[in-house]
């Protein structure tokens, strides 16, 4: 009986989570995703089609 309880406690220990590590990893991922998003927005490389519209207007003149 004691052996069965020891086996069950060892199996349950495999599935315990270290919530502090998970939280830190999530915060680091969120910070990196935020910085990458800001770099994309403020890079000036992607202008949502503004350049194409300006070229079309200049070609007509």
UniProtKB/Swiss-Prot annotation:
InterPro entries cross-referenced by the UniProt entry: ATNG, FXYD_motif, Ion-transport_regulator_FXYD
Transmembrane domains' residue ranges: 24-44
Topological type in the membrane: Single-pass type III membrane protein
Biological process annotations from GO: potassium ion transport; regulation of monoatomic ion transport; sodium ion transport
Pfam families linked: ATP1G1_PLM_MAT8
Keywords associated with the record: Ion transport, Membrane, Potassium, Potassium transport, Sodium, Sodium transport, Sodium/potassium transport, Transmembrane, Transmembrane helix, Transport
One GO location term (cellular component): membrane
GO molecular function: sodium channel regulator activity
Alphabetized Gene3D superfamilies for the sequence: Single helix bin (1.20.5.780)
The keyword Phosphoprotein appears for this protein: no
Cellular localization per UniProt: Membrane
Function: May be involved in forming the receptor site for cardiac glycoside binding or may modulate the transport function of the sodium ATPase.
Family: Belongs to the FXYD family.
Subunit structure: Regulatory subunit of the sodium/potassium-transporting ATPase which is composed of a catalytic alpha subunit, an auxiliary non-catalytic beta subunit and an additional regulatory subunit.
UniProt protein name: Sodium/potassium-transporting ATPase subunit gamma
């Amino acid at each position: 009986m004691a052996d069965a309880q020891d086996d069950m406690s060892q199996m349950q220990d495999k599935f315990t989570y270290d919530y502090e590590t998970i939280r830190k990893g999530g915060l680091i991922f969120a910070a990196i995703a935020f910085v990458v998003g800001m770099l994309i927005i403020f890079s000036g490389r992607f202008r949502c089609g503004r350049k194409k519209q300006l070229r079309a207007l200049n070609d007509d003149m």
